[in-house]
Every structure is written in C-alpha cells, then in structure tokens.
C-alpha cells in the first residue's frame, strides 16, 4: 500500500523537512531525454542524507564531495575561522586531534548471474546499464533493470524512487515528442505497478508532477480528470502546493489546467487573472528581448572571429624550416602535424595571446576537441587525394596512413551491423551467451556513433601497440582496456557537448514559462523562505558520470577489438619466386594468438609483419590533441574534475584505476575547504606563461635535420659494429654469447629510434608553438607533488626541452639579475659546487667561449657541448651574450628561467625533522662560506671505511682503494631518503663502477657485483652515522605504519562482529565471487592473518597544507570476465581490498617526505605569486627571473622554516592517535617470555580461537571506555590475552618491533638469498611485482627498485665474511650449504605469539639540537 505523506497539520518547519526529505539529492548526468534535461546518475554513491536543506543562495558542492564525509571529534569547522586577511601562503591551523575521516557507506551487494533478459547481476553494473539505456532511449530495457532491482530489493526506497523518477521523466519526454494513448497508459501502469509491489516509497512532488504532465496529454476529459485527481490526492494540499507547483516540470498552461480541474489549487482570490496574464506577457517580452541581445552578442563574436581570418592566413612561407621526420613519415608525425594544423595558418610572429580572451578560449576549445575529427578528416583527405591520382589504396603502399580510411569505413559498417545484432538480441526471448553479452555492452556503444567509435578503436589500438612495441604485440586484456577507456572518454566528451546545448535550450524555455515569480496559491501559508526551500529541493545537482566498471569496459573493449580484427585487412604485393609475376594477397592486419608467458596461456594480439614495419616507421601518439600545452591560461581549479583544460575533464589528482579511497578523501577535503591552498598553488603554476626560445630552437632544428648525434639528440642512422656470426661448428655457448651481444645492440638501436621518435613529436609541437604564449596546467599525485599535465612538451622534460623554455613575460636583469645569470651558466655547465663568487668568475672567464657558442654553435669550438646540460647552457649563452651586447647589460629584459636547486631536498627535510646538526651542515641548512656537498661528505666516510678495512688486509678494500668518487655514491645517497633498498642501491653502484672501471673484474679477480655490494654497505653505514636523528624518525615511521597496517578500526570491528553473528559466520559476504590474489591460507595457525586480509587499514595522514594523503597500495582481487573473444581474468580494484602491508610499510617514510617537499613548493609558489614573481618548479628545483632570485630564495627559506618550526612529527603522532583511536592491532610477542606462557595457559583453558578472542577483546575495551562505572568494573575483571599482557609487561613493551630493513636510512643488507627470500615473501603477501605500474621517479629509479625486498641484515664484519664466501663458493655449493644450515638451526628458530592489543604508538624519537631558524641566513640552501 502506498503510504501517504504527513498531513498538512504539520508546522511549516516540519513541512519543509518533509519536502526536503521526500527526494534525495543524487548525482546527475546528462541525458538525451528528460523533461529536466538531466538524469540522476546512480544511488550507489550516496552515503549520507542531509537532514537540513542547504540554502538556495549558496552553490552546493557535488554530492561526491560529501560521499561518506563524517566529522569525528571536533573538525576544522569548529576551529576559529581564518581571517579574510590571512595570506594564502601562511599555513592554516588545523587540529590533528580531529582529522578528516571518510566512511564509505557504499554497500557491497551479493553478485548474481546475468538473468535471461540480459540484465547484469552486479548492482553497480545495473545502474550503469540503466543510465545508458535512458541515454539512448531504450526505455524498455531500463524498465527491465528497474524490475530486477525491485525483485532483488537491494536499493533503499528513496533511491529506488529517484531511479523511477528518471525513468518516468524519460517516458514523459518520449510521450510529448510522439503523443500516443498506449504510451500514456504505459506510464500510468508503470506507476501502479510500482505502488502495488508492497514497497513503501516516499512519493514526492517530482513524481506527482511528472504523472500530472502525462495525464494532461489525455484527449478524454473524464480520464484526464480522474488521473489528475488521483495523483494530487497522493499528497496533502499544502505539500502539493510547495512541491508539485514549484517544480520546473509543469508549464504555466499546465498549471492553469490542473487548477481548473482541481479548484482548490486555484490562484488566490486577490489575484486578478487579467493582471496576472498581463504580467506574464510582459515577462515573456523581456525574456525575448534578452534572447535577441544574446543572439546579437553571439553574432558579433562570430563576426570578430571571421575578421581575424586574414591575420591567420599568411601569403608567404614560414621562414622556419620543417622538422625532418624520423623515417616514420606519415601516421605518427603527420598526426601531430594535423593536430597542431591550426598553427600552420598563423603567420610568423603572430601571437594568439594578443586576441581577445573569448577568441583565445575558442581556439583552445577547438584544439582540445580536434583529436578524432582531425584523424577522420586526414584519412578521408588522403584517401581522396590518392583516388584522384588514380592510385589503389588497397595495394601495397609505403604508408599505413593510406589504409586507415578503408579500415575506418569497413569497421564503421561492421559496427552498424553490430548495433542491429544488439537490437535483435535484446528482443529475442531465449538468449544465448552472445545475446547476453550484446545486451550488456549494447547500450554503451549506442551512446556514440559508428564513425567515431571506429576511429577511436583504430587510434587506440595502434597507439597501444606502438607504445608497447609493435613486434611484441599486446595482451588482449591491456589492449581492450586501452580501447574501452578511450571510447568511454570520447563518449563523455560528446555527452558534455550535448549537455551544454541542452542547458542553453532549457534555460531559454524555462525563462519563457516561469510564472512562479508572481504565482501564489490558495491555502498556502508557507513563508517566502519555505518557498525558496522548496525550489532548492528540485535543483538537479549535476556531477560527472560514474566510470564504467571493469566488466563493462572489458565487454565493450572486446566487442570493438573483435570488430576491428574482423575487418582490418592489409594487401601485400609479392613477387612469385618462380614466375616473377606480382601476386596480391589480402591478409588480416592483426591476429589473435595464445602465447605462453610465465607458464600461463595469455591471449595476445600480434600485428601482421607488414603492419609492424609500418608502425616502427610511423609511431602513433596517444590522443595527443587533448594534452597539448594551452594557448590560454588554464581555468582555475574549483572541484575534483573542474579546472585546467576548457573541454577535457582532467582530475586534479592523478589516480590509478580503482583508487576510490583517495578520491573520496580528496573530494571531502574539497567540500570543507581543505584543498584551497593546493588549488590556488596549482593555479599559480598553471598561469605561468611560456614561449619557445627561437635561437636555441633553430640550432636544435639544424642538428635534427642533419641527422647527426649532438648532445642528447640521437643520430638518424646509428652505426653499430656487429660482431661476425660464429661458424655453425663452433661451441654452442659461443653462438649464445653472439646472440646475446646482437640482442643488446638491437635493443640499443631500438631505444635510440624510440627516443628520436619522441623527440620528433616534441620538436613538431615546439615548431607549432614557436610564436605563441602557452601554459602548462598542473595537477598533483596522491602525495601532493605537482606535475604539468601535457606529457610531451613541458618544463620537466629532458635537457633539450628545458633549453627551449623561456618565460613569456620578461624582466630587466638589474645588478642582481646579471650576477645570477652568470651563476646559472656555471650551474648548468656543471661548475655548481663552487662558491657563488667563483661561479660568477667562471662565466666572466669564459666570455669568449660564450660568444663563440652563440655566433657559431655548430662549427665553432663547441664549448657549450662540454656542459653537463648542453642545451640549457646554450640557452644561457644566448641570454648572457645578448645582455652583454648592450651598453648597460643590467637593462636587458631577460626571459630565461633561472634555477635554484635544493641540496638533496629529502635529506634537508629529514635533517630538520631529526634535528641532526651534522647532517644539516651537509645539506646547507646551516650558513656557510661555501656550499656543502653531502655526496662528497659521504664519499669521504666511505673512503675512510675502506682504508680501515685495508689496514686489516681486506681483499675488497684492496680492489676499491682509490676508486671511490663523488659520482659513485651520488645516486645512492640521493635516492636513499626516498626508499631505495639495498638491491636498488647495489644496482646503482654497480653501474657507476662498471662505467668508471670496465676492467675491474679482470684486474682484481673479484666480480664487480660483489664489489658493488661491498661499497653499498659502506654507503649505508655512512648515511646512518651522518643522519642519526633521521634514521630514528624513519624507524618510528616504519613502526607506527606497520601497526596501522595490522590494525582494525572500530568500524571494522563492528563489521567483523556483525559478520560473525550472521548465518554465514565466516566473516565474508554471501555470494561474493571475487578472490584475493595470492595463495589462500587454510591453516588454523593463520586465522588472524585471514581476519587482517579482510579488514586491514591503509596509512592516511594530512600534509601541512591540509591535503589528505591515502597510500594506494592494496592487493587487488581478480574476476573472470567472459567476452566475445575469450575469457579474461581481470584485476578488480576495490576500496575493500586488503592493503599490501609490505608496500604500505616501505613507502610510508619516503611518501611522507614527498608530502612535505610538495607542501614546501606550493607554499613557495603562493608567496611568490603574492610578491608578483613568476614561478615554476620541477619538484625541488624552483625557477624564476634572474632579477627575482634573491626574493625567491628568501621565500624558499621562509616557507621551509614555517613548516619545520611546527612540531611536524608530533602533529603526525596526534593525528594517528585520533584517526585510529579505539583500534586493535595484531601484535607479536616471543613465546619464551613469561607473558607468552601465561597467555598460552589461558588459551588452553578457554579454547576460544582467534575470532572469539578478538570479539572478547573488543567487548572488554568497550566496557573499559563506558561511562557506567559498573561496566568499567566488569571490563577490569575480564581476562583476555591483552589483559594478561598489560599485567605482565607493564614495565616495558614486549611486542616484537617491525622489520624495518626496507625503511631506514643506512639499512645494511646481505648479498645473496635475495631472490629466494623475495619469492617466498611475495607468495605470502600474494603480490606480483608486475601487477603494479612502474612509477618512474625523477632520478630514473622505478618503483620496483625503490620498494624491492631486502635480504637479511649484515653488521660489522659479517658482511665481509659473506662476500668472501660468495667469491670462493659456486652457487650450487652455497645453496646446499645454506639449506643444511637452515635445517640444522630449525630448533633454535624464534617463535612468536599473536595477540590483539589496543593500538598505541611508541614515543616520538628525541630530536637533535639543530635549530631550523638558523636556515634564514643560509645562502646555499637553494642555489
């Protein structure tokens, strides 16, 4: 029975709450149908319902910004408000005792099978299919989804009603477009069916208004009267007046008709109908005048755009030569050229920034939207040009580009056939497997048109193959994901454009029919405020479409790829070896094969050899157009996906697939204003204008077109001396060695070619932008580090790209600027460890070399090529020479960015945190006459250690004596602070030793790898000595991080208790079919680990800028997805996935430091902007004009001091204590202790098991926290393992500390057993290294090296003993020896006991005596 809403006897306040509560505010997405022009996205994202309606005068955040947002304790909202005069660059106060906490209330529903109608069983996928069906007008399919949701009874009533309203909205819109009695009857039947299913649904004004609109289409007056009366009776008069009549659904004429049919809803007696009609007519005239004015403005804009056409058409050819294409002529390079083709029509010297802003934005929008359209137009034009020349494009031609048009047309035809098949599959009563697949992916491919889908499929397929190596092919799983992502992105762009047009039309219509400004109703006692409240209740809050699920992406991508494989053909022309005639043969362009990889059969797409040859010559850029530099300042960041590019939605946070938790925290922080400083900082970085350095570009272009190798530009045709192939009669090992050498050469050749291809793109973009002012929009990673979004050309690029960059805005040098310009020259040359005066003198002493480099860069003495950064050196030479040409060089207007680099910035932060005076001196935190060099200091300590070993006649010391230089230790010292492990450090040292001493193995008789291990031990020991305070902090960070990763929060404990008391009683959800990666643990000894696998917590903290950081490392589950090509096992990332404890622990200290240096950079950017400085940054390298360097350096020091003047570590400890308050963690204690023996006796007596022990401890802690003294007393009397631990270990902490070998500075580790131990722990963790994307750090290290596992510790001489043993024993004998030793020591192995304890953290390490305020006078902090 349908419940009636509360009676009209309620107070106005209660009525407003009823009105607000009758309909939840849900996310919105665009719709091609619908009265309101927007559809609610899905209720799966809704986690909280606001009990107080927001003010209609304030712009409300998108619902996802408040998903799961809860305030615990006192939040920032309770703190004193920041005054309006507080500068942005000042740190905002926040209470670490009240951290932002997000609870994701998204329910995990039991997954069902796809039903016989082809409706998926996953609730999230049902929502997506429902939205897609409404979008493409397949309302009968949408009705089937609604029916299944109702049958499963998994959606709350209010959310289900909102879904029904969306369906009703679309049905009514369809009825109005095509009036039909049957369609109207379907609407009424659908409502009655919903009412009669027994669910109590809170029907509100929106539902009634839609039903009334459908009723008014009836041609029978009696039927119309009956329906209108019936639907209005569902709501009391007062509620109907405030909701139904205040929606935007019913027009004035329809409201008048309803009032005629039901007189009690008529206008008040004191309103004259003639006066009312006259007012409406006047209002419509005003709206019409406004529309005409708007049209005139639009016309004037169009005319102004036409008027600039002559400016954009040059009659003379450009003076800048074309960029010589690396034998890739055609597809890849031509695509770049086509993408930036609009610049080719602009005469030299014309800057788009001189146009009005509206025209600049129009050009930028065109640039962003030009990707697929440019490809289609280019393919079509080339095909037509070949046809005009009488060439057959199906025959063997030298360019893949000539075939793409035919591929596109054939694929377009196949997709049209596919859509017909989808429609048939939806209609057939008995569906087979293919029909069910089509029913799922059909609504999604219908959202685009076949022409665009075909182009997107071809572009994404070729780009994926080209990026991964065409000759190797690509796995089906990665390829279909790549295709589906780009198809999804393209569909979103099309929907966004349609939504903008629909909004404009809707606004025009609503302004013509808006009687609510003068309309008042009889019996309405609500105040104006309540009327506004009712209006605000009906505002559709729009948000971004929810991303497709992995299953939907897989099915869509597989369907598109399968269609491409069926249609893409390549025609080969070959000569018959016998008859010498030409034979034409059609072959598939791609093949689907199964390959063995690591013992598993993997579906792979292999291109035809002819296609591979073309792809090698013609690499394909990856949707380049949407990620070019902007020609207008980026839009300011205002929400998670609103900012930067004008047309392309880009998230402010760089996320991997499925990282939902970081997004939830970020959106919650945005909602309460915590991201304001980060947003403003990104805006500052983005608004910095750039231009191309023309003199350097011309030199670079000459080098490029010559095909020679100069600086870091590889040669066009590299020459390698190939070793002669050994005779077939020789030893097979010789042949294997020859093949290995050939492979190395081919890999190097391929690497140089790839490098040149990428540079080709960069130079083509630089040529297109050579006269333009352009901008790099920025976003951040999960730690808060800022990165430019355009990936191909930006100031974070290699030396040749940085050499091309100039600030668009120039500033006179002045005395200070001239001095810093000279210092910068010395820095980029490599003379950067001298004093500032010595660096200035270096430039003065090389004036002739500088002038020669400028006047004759390629044929002179080429002094600039000897620099550490030659292209940046050349750019500085041009700038300095131009200044010196003036009578007064200080008056020269300089555009060159001057860099100020930190001295191992991570160690600077660690030294400040730990208070290490010695360490602070080595990283220039302490004032000095000359710059300190931490790398040289570490090298000296290593040399001293080797000399000590030499005195003991150590053979390794003899081999390395006199061979330790600054360069050998530099990379290891630099990366140590960022989590480099022993394995990664050893690789770094080995690379340096082999480069400097290639014959060291032959000379010393010791393998270079063993010598690298020896040196690495000394480096790590030196680091731990120099940075003792930092070492202690890393230990502390690792310990608290490890405890958090083994903890259960109160919410998780409650969930665990509910699952234990459920009928299943196994702690898992019924019907769950996702399995965790790794080996399941079935032994009873691992019950606690099973609990943790389901409920582990990730490490979360807040940066000084109040940005929440959520570490993303989890062990994702897998799911088998059936597609039209093959069954695929796909990774399914979920927020509920257990964390990868090993990576969480290892990554915490370096990520924490990264979050500090990111905060330092943003604060510096904000302060520089306040002072009017131009600012750019490359992590810990900050750039500005030469004349502003002194000001920027003062800002950098001030920001660092402000960050570290606060108790950063103390605040982190307080935040963790608050964030993980009342949690329990799984601790380990040694079995030989007294407390362990008592616990074992208790367990023997009680026999509870791990699960019940956990529940027992949960109950005990709740009683102890109770405000009831009796409960507290009961808790004190309870006996549990934790209470026994508290009783017997009150004097000291007996828990086993975390294994921190992977975490701390100066970590020493052994050499062998790495792979064995690593493999064993990987099995235990259930993690496969290859499953994570490799994240390259600025030092060139990859994440797998930074987070590699560690072998066992080695202290003192034990490391040398083992190295000697390794040298003198073969691998097999060593393995046998260690296996026996392991068995022999089995009885002595330590055993541990697991117990659940309240989560507490160890005390903060004592800080050293370094005072960070002394930094204020340090000249070389950044220099």
Swiss-Prot record:
EC numbers: 2.7.7.6
Catalytic activity: RNA(n) + a ribonucleoside 5'-triphosphate = RNA(n+1) + diphosphate
UniProt entry tagged with the keyword DNA damage: no
EC class name: transferase
Biased composition (Low complexity): 278-297
A GO molecular function held by the record: mitochondrial promoter sequence-specific DNA binding
Keywords: DNA-directed RNA polymerase, Mitochondrion, Nucleotidyltransferase, Transcription, Transferase, Transit peptide
Region ranges (Disordered): 266-303, 1055-1087, 1316-1342
GO CC term, one of those recorded: mitochondrial DNA-directed RNA polymerase complex
Chain's role: DNA-dependent RNA polymerase catalyzes the transcription of DNA into RNA using the four ribonucleoside triphosphates as substrates.
Listed name of the protein: DNA-directed RNA polymerase, mitochondrial
Organism of provenance: Neurospora crassa (strain ATCC 24698 / 74-OR23-1A / CBS 708.71 / DSM 1257 / FGSC 987)
């Amino acid at each position: 029975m349908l419940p009636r809403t509360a009676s009209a006897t309620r107070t106005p306040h209660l009525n407003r709450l009823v009105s607000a509560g009758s309909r939840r505010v849900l996310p919105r997405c665009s719709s091609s149908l619908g009265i309101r022009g927007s559809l609610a996205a899905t209720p799966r994202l809704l986690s909280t319902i606001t009990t107080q309606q927001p003010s209609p005068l304030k712009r409300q955040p998108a619902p996802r910004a408040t998903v799961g947002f809860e305030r615990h304790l006192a939040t920032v909202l309770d703190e004193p408000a920041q005054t309006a005069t507080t500068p942005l660059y000042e740190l905002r106060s926040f209470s670490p005792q009240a951290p932002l906490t997000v609870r994701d209330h998204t329910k995990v529903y039991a997954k069902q099978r796809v039903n016989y109608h082809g409706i998926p069983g996953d609730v999230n996928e049902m929502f997506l299919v429902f939205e897609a069906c409404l979008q493409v007008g397949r309302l009968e399919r949408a009705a089937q989804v609604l029916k299944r949701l109702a049958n499963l009874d998994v959606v709350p009533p209010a959310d289900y009603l909102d879904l029904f309203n969306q369906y009703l909205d679309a049905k009514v819109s369809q009825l109005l477009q095509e009036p039909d009695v049957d369609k109207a009857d379907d609407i009424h039947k659908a409502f009655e069916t919903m009412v009669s299913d027994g669910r109590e649904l809170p029907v509100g004004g929106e539902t009634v208004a839609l039903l009334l609109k459908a009723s008014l289409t009836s041609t029978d007056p009696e039927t119309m009267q009956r329906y209108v009366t019936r639907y209005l009776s569902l709501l009391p008069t007062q509620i109907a007046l405030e909701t139904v009549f205040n929606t935007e659904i019913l027009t004035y004429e329809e409201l008048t008709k309803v009032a005629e049919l039901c007189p009690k809803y008529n206008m008040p007696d004191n309103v004259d109908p003639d006066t009312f009609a006259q007012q409406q007519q006047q209002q419509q005239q005003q709206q019409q005048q406004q529309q005409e004015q708007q049209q005139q403005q639009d016309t004037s804009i169009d005319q102004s755009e036409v008027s600039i056409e002559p400016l954009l058409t040059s009659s003379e050819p450009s003076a800048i030569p074309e960029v010589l294409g690396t034998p890739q002529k055609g597809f890849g390079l031509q695509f770049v050229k086509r993408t930036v083709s609009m610049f080719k029509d602009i005469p030299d010297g014309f800057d788009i920034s001189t146009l009005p802003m509206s025209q600049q934005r129009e050009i930028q929008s065109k640039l962003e939207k030009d990707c697929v359209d440019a490809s289609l137009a280019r393919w079509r034009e080339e095909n037509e040009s070949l046809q005009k020349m009488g060439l057959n494009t199906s025959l063997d031609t030298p360019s893949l580009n000539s075939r793409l048009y035919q591929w596109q047309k054939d694929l377009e035809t196949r997709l049209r056939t596919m859509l017909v098949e989808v429609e048939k599959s939806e209609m057939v009563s008995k569906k087979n497997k293919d029909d069910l697949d089509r029913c799922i992916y059909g609504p999604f491919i219908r959202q685009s048109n076949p022409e665009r889908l075909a182009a997107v499929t071809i572009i994404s397929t070729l780009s994926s193959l080209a990026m991964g190596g065409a000759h190797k092919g690509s796995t089906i799983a990665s390829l279909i994901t790549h295709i589906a992502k780009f198809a999804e992105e393209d569909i979103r762009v099309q929907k966004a454009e349609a939504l903008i047009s629909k909004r404009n039309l809707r606004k025009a219509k609503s302004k013509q029919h808006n009687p609510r400004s003068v309309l008042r109703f009889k019996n309405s006692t609500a105040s104006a405020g309540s009327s506004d409240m009712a209006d605000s209740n009906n505002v559709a809050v729009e948000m971004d479409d929810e991303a497709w699920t992995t299953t939907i992406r897989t099915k869509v991508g597989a369907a598109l790829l399968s269609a491409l494989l069926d249609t893409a053909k390549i025609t080969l022309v070959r000569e018959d070896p016998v008859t010498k005639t030409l034979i034409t043969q059609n072959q598939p362009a791609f093949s689907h094969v199964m390959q063995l990889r690591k013992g598993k059969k993997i579906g792979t797409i292999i291109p035809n050899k002819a296609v591979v040859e073309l792809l090698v010559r013609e690499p394909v850029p990856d949707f380049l157009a949407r990620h070019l530099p902007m020609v207008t300042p980026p839009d300011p960041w205002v929400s998670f996906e609103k900012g930067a590019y004008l047309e392309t939605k880009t998230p402010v946070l760089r996320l991997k697939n499925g990282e939902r938790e970081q997004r939830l925290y970020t959106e919650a922080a945005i909602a309460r204003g915590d991201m304001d400083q980060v947003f403003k900082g990104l805006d500052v970085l983005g608004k910095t204008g750039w231009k191309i350095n023309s003199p350097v570009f011309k030199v670079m272009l000459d080098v490029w077109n010559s095909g020679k190798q100069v600086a870091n530009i590889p040669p066009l045709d590299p020459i390698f001396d190939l070793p002669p192939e050994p005779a077939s009669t020789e030893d097979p090992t010789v042949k294997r060695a020859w093949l290995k050498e050939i492979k190395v050469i081919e890999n190097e050749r391929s690497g140089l070619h790839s490098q040149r291809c990428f540079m080709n793109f960069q130079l083509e973009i630089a040529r297109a932008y050579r006269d333009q002012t352009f901008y790099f929009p920025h976003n951040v990673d999960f730690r808060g580090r800022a990165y430019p979004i355009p990936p191909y050309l930006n100031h974070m690029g290699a030396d040749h790209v940085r050499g091309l960059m100039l600030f668009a805005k120039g500033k006179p040098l002045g005395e200070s600027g001239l001095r810093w310009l000279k210092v910068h020259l010395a820095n980029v040359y490599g003379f950067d460890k001298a004093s500032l005066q010595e660096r200035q003198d270096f430039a003065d002493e090389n004036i002739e070399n500088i002038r020669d480099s400028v006047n004759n860069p390629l044929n002179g003495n080429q002094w600039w090529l000897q620099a550490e950064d030659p292209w940046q050196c050349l750019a500085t030479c041009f700038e300095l020479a131009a200044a010196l040409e003036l009578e007064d060089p200080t008056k020269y207007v300089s555009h060159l960015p001057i860099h100020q680099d930190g001295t191992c910035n991570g160690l600077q932060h660690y030294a400040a945190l730990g208070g290490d005076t010695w360490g602070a001196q080595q990283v220039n935190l302490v004032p000095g006459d000359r710059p300190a060099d931490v790398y040289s200091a570490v090298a000296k300590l290593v040399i001293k250690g080797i000399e000590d070993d030499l005195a003991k006649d150590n053979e390794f010391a003899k081999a390395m004596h006199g061979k330790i230089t600054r360069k050998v230790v530099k990379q290891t010292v630099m990366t140590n602070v960022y989590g480099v492990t022993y394995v990664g450090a050893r690789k770094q040292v080995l690379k340096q030793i082999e480069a400097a001493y290639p014959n060291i193995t032959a000379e010393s008789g010791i393998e270079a790898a063993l010598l690298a291990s020896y040196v690495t031990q000394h480096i790590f020991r030196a680091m731990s000595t120099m940075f003792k305070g930092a070492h202690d902090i890393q230990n502390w960070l690792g310990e608290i991080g490890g405890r958090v990763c083994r903890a259960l929060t109160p919410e998780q404990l409650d969930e665990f208790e509910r699952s234990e008391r459920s009928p299943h009683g196994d702690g898992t959800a019924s019907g769950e079919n996702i399995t965790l990666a790794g080996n399941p643990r079935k032994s009873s000894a691992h019950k606690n680990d099973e609990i943790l696998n389901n409920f582990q917590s990730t490490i979360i903290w807040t940066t000084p800028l109040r940005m929440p950081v959520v570490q993303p490392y989890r062990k994702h589950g897998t799911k088998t997805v059936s597609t039209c090509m093959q069954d695929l096992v796909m990774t399914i990332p979920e927020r509920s996935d257990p964390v990868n404890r090993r990576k969480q622990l290892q990554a915490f200290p370096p990520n924490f430091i990264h979050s500090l240096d990111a905060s330092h950079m943003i604060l510096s950017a904000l302060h520089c902007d306040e002072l009017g400085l131009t600012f750019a940054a490359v992590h810990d390298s900050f750039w500005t004009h030469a004349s502003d360097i002194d000001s920027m350096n003062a800002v950098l020091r001030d920001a660092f001091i402000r960050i570290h003047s606060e108790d950063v570590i103390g605040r982190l400890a307080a935040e963790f204590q608050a964030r993980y308050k009342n949690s329990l963690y799984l601790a380990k204690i040694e079995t030989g202790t007294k407390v362990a023996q008592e616990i074992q006796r208790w367990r023997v007596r009680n026999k509870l098991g791990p699960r019940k022990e956990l529940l027992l401890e949960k109950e005990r802690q709740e009683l102890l926290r109770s405000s009831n003294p009796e409960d507290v007393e009961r808790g004190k009397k309870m006996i549990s393992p934790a209470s026994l631990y508290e009783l017997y270990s009150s004097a000291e902490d007996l828990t086993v500390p975390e294994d921190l070998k992977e975490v701390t500075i100066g970590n020493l580790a052994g050499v062998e057993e790495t792979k064995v131990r690593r493999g064993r722990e990987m099995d235990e963790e259930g993690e496969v290294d290859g499953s994570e994307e490799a994240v390259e750090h600025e030092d060139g290290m990859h994440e797998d090296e930074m987070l590699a596992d560690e072998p066992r510790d080695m202290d003192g001489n034990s490391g040398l003993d083992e190295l000697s043993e390794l040298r003198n024993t073969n691998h097999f004998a060593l393995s046998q020896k260690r296996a026996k030793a392991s068995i022999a020591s089995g009885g002595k192995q330590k055993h541990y006991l697991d117990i659940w304890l309240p989560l507490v953290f160890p005390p903060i390490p004592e800080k050293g005596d370094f005072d960070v305020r002394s930094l204020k006078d340090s000249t070389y902090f950044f220099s």
